[in-house]
Amino acid sequence: MSFEGARLSMRSRRNGTLGSTRTLYSSVSRSTDVSYSESDLVNFIQANFKKRECVFFTRDSKAMESICKCGYAQSQHIEGTQINQNEKWNYKKHTKEFPTDAFGDIQFETLGKKGKYLRLSCDTDSETLYELLTQHWHLKTPNLVISVTGGAKNFALKPRMRKIFSRLIYIAQSKGAWILTGGTHYGLMKYIGEVVRDNTISRNSEENIVAIGIAAWGMVSNRDTLIRNCDDEGHFSAQYIMDDFMRDPLYILDNNHTHLLLVDNGCHGHPTVEAKLRNQLEKYISERTSQDSNYGGKIPIVCFAQGGGRETLKAINTSVKSKIPCVVVEGSGQIADVIASLVEVEDVLTSSMVKEKLVRFLPRTVSRLPEEEIESWIKWLKEILESPHLLTVIKMEEAGDEVVSSAISYALYKAFSTNEQDKDNWNGQLKLLLEWNQLDLASDEIFTNDRRWESADLQEVMFTALIKDRPKFVRLFLENGLNLQKFLTNEVLTELFSTHFSTLVYRNLQIAKNSYNDALLTFVWKLVANFRRSFWKEDRSSREDLDVELHDASLTTRHPLQALFIWAILQNKKELSKVIWEQTKGCTLAALGASKLLKTLAKVKNDINAAGESEELANEYETRAVELFTECYSSDEDLAEQLLVYSCEAWGGSNCLELAVEATDQHFIAQPGVQNFLSKQWYGEISRDTKNWKIILCLFIIPLVGCGLVSFRKKPIDKHKKLLWYYVAFFTSPFVVFSWNVVFYIAFLLLFAYVLLMDFHSVPHTPELILYALVFVLFCDEVRQWYMNGVNYFTDLWNVMDTLGLFYFIAGIVFRLHSSNKSSLYSGRVIFCLDYIIFTLRLIHIFTVSRNLGPKIIMLQRMLIDVFFFLFLFAVWMVAFGVARQGILRQNEQRWRWIFRSVIYEPYLAMFGQVPSDVDSTTYDFSHCTFSGNESKPLCVELDEYNLPRFPEWITIPLVCIYMLSTNILLVNLLVAMFGYTVGIVQENNDQVWKFQRYFLVQEYCNRLNIPFPFVVFAYFYMVVKKCFKCCCKEKNTESSACCFRNEDNETLAWEGVMKENYLVKINTKANDNAEEMRHRFRQLDTKLNDLKGLLKEIANKIK
């Protein structure tokens, strides 16, 4: 039966008790902390590892020369060897153990490859050998052992088989596995070594692949070079020669294996000597208990077989008897195909049936075997097939990247689940499938209807699924009873944020926090730092970090789901974060918070690819927020609007609107539901149906407010105070406040212009004093905004203009009031005039309220940035031309003013068409210049001996032409193209851009005091006095945070949870519909192809 067929035919297991393992399975094994010196290694090897020498010479009657049955000549035996006649040779009787003399490092000549090797007796204890590998050769404890067998002779490797081997090596590298092979440079072992080499080079991994070759010492060619000299007591490096042209039956060692174990039984030229020791080592490792293993506390081992003959068959037989699962590659030929074909037989297996398969797949081999040997083969095959659960077959033609790993994991699972000791260890089985990411097996075989899982049973595997980024398993555990709220204890979160949190991410987060310094980034950084502070306490060099703690330590315990979501988001765990997001409360807020974090981190990441991934994930969460809010708004507008202003301390105390704006999520802000909410804020209690001209008219004729000209969204409760309520509702509307401010500002500009043009005297008159008072009110308002916004105040261009205008005005007052001389008075007036420009340009801000003019302001702002970069390019041409022109025409001009005019000013004017007239000698006018340089004229050009201009016209005129061509045509058109691109970008998102900018205007006037200018100054004085009083009395705010605990919040979040489920159902339905549509299209295409094929056949028949 094939791998897929066997997998589908497995029956569900009955319930059992969960075993427990102390630690989680890790793909990176732990190596011993004990370090050994070279002398300790030599002493250990010489004390525990032996070689075998034949001590009885038994002549081989079949040999032509005087050769012992051990394979060595008599001269090659040690001194004192006894001579026997016609006695059957046995290594236990006729050989003796001596301390090994071949071990150390092996250097393959001309290839530069190094590895370790050891000659050891075939009776070496497996425990001692394992100790050598792990503690003295410092190999990490394997998480998996893959024993590869088959095809010991040279053969042409098929491309499909090479791909399978490549995937096998990748699995070994990623899982921290050992690969065991025959270790020679022939057949399968040679190809395995080449794939190991290619993967090591291409992946450039710090974790080297461990490939252990176990070969027979007596079959190794050039083995004399491996023997140490008698005086070599320490480190020894053998220079091994790989002679591929040798024709003797001996093998050369493979240069791509990292470790070589050369098994010695005292004979020469006898193959398969190493099989016994290899089988014992595999069995020992498979039975060895490891704390890091997911295989019931044991190290998993699997036999991987392809092709092969007698020895491969024996190796598979031995593995099956040792309860080691085997993966057989069907299509690789020989014994592997025999086993694959017999696995699929459902009838009773008979000897004739087995022999038929042998003859079919190994005709030449079977024809040369005696009948007794064939019976042995049949017996071994029957023994193998008595344990079909230990056999997994994959087809070579269908073996893709995932098939090999799935086959290995499936083989391990079948062996584990059918083992008498482990078949009820559901926890161990689940860990195994989790490690290999086999979700389907876990769903079909473990999470069945006949077993009920407790939340505590799944907590350990849930933690593993989180750190290994297994989102599908996380979802599976949640669907089967895991309580995420109970699972996320403070200890679990501390482990996640400290041990399983990237240091690079933490540094980027700290950089972002310092660069942008907003509430969310500060909160998240403190959250992470709070979990990591135990590690910082060990670093005394950074004591300032010890003070980084959350003000409320219980915050993370109140919002563990949000903390876990932040952990996943910061590390770009895309699918995992989506699973966790579905479990959180306040999903809309969480999605916008994720978008904000990811976009901010993307700005500080040096890796372009990582930054792009963060941007992509941020856009996905913005889309989720948009779609979920649309779902909510279509169901209930009022509750959806409550979601917009719902804030949570887990997201820095920000609400949805604030996070969306900070993340520049224009798509979210442009949603109809959000815009309707902003419109309600903008008009306040005034009905949106009221025409704007009616509101403006009521500003000038106030009694009309109570005459019904303006309609309101609701009626006053107290009818006796109806008129008062109308006036209060009208004048507290942000739109009315805005309109009144516009009227006031226009009046202010008119007064400013009147003072500058008609009433500016040495002693200020009444209009000018009123102007000072109005500017003081504006100054108070800017101080209030700065106090409320803090550092973020200067991130707004309009605030920068306001500040600049006020400072200019103060400077103008200083000069203007210092009127002891006319020069100072004039300077003050000039400053006032320049300041008037700033105040007038500030009027542009009011146009953002217009749907048509608002985007145009954005275009102007972005085009100013284009002009800024354009000036850098233009400056290159301008300075190059200006300096060259001045140097050619004039000599030693000392006046900086005229140098500036000639080098900068005149070339700048040339861009607008004013051609320089001093580059043509025929039109040069000496009356407009000076030779002495002491007049208010430019310096005349240098003259020659004939009193004619010295400069060569064949240089100056072409120079002007080239400059005019470059600036007036190339650069100006480049600027026009830049403007066109900028306008196009804004125009594409015209509506979104305006709606996004509208938010700032609405919030600005919603946060203002609802008192008309300039009377608001009295409210400012009141606020200052109140603040001073609080500071003097040292009043403290004792209100505790009620975040997420108010009834209205709980009701809103519960309703949002229902809407979220509806939204997820729609997404999944849409995805299924798309998949079904694709399948339908493929079926239609297949039908058309079949019809076309039939038509072509008919045409071919007609032609014939």
Curated annotation (Swiss-Prot):
Pfam families: Ion_trans (PF00520), LSDAT_euk (PF18139), TRPM2 (PF25508). Expressed in dorsal root and trigeminal ganglia. Specifically expressed in a subset of sensory neurons, including cold-sensitive neurons in trigeminal neurons. Ca(2+) binds at E782, Q785, N799, D802. It is a multi-pass membrane protein. It comes from the Eukaryota. One of its GO terms (biological process) is positive regulation of cold-induced thermogenesis. It is found in: Cell membrane; Membrane raft. The chain crosses the membrane at residues 734-758, 766-789, 797-817, 823-848, 854-890, 954-984. GO terms for molecular function: calcium channel activity; identical protein binding; ligand-gated calcium channel activity; metal ion binding; monoatomic ion channel activity. Keywords: Calcium, Cell membrane, Coiled coil, Ion channel, Ion transport, Membrane, Metal-binding, Sensory transduction, Transmembrane, Transmembrane helix, Transport. Activated by cold temperatures and by both natural and synthetic cooling compounds such as menthol and icilin. Activation of the channel requires the presence of PI(4,5)P2; PI(4,5)P2 is necessary to gate the channel. Activated by intracellular Ca(2+). Residues 1-733, 790-796, 849-853, 985-1104 are cytoplasmic. Residues 1067-1104 form a coiled coil. Signal peptide: none annotated. One of its GO terms (cellular component) is membrane. Belongs to the transient receptor (TC 1.A.4) family. LTrpC subfamily. TRPM8 sub-subfamily. Homotetramer. Interacts (via N-terminus and C-terminus domains) with TCAF1; the interaction stimulates TRPM8 channel activity. Interacts (via N-terminus and C-terminus domains) with TCAF2; the interaction inhibits TRPM8 channel activity. This is Transient receptor potential cation channel subfamily M member 8. It comes from Rattus norvegicus.
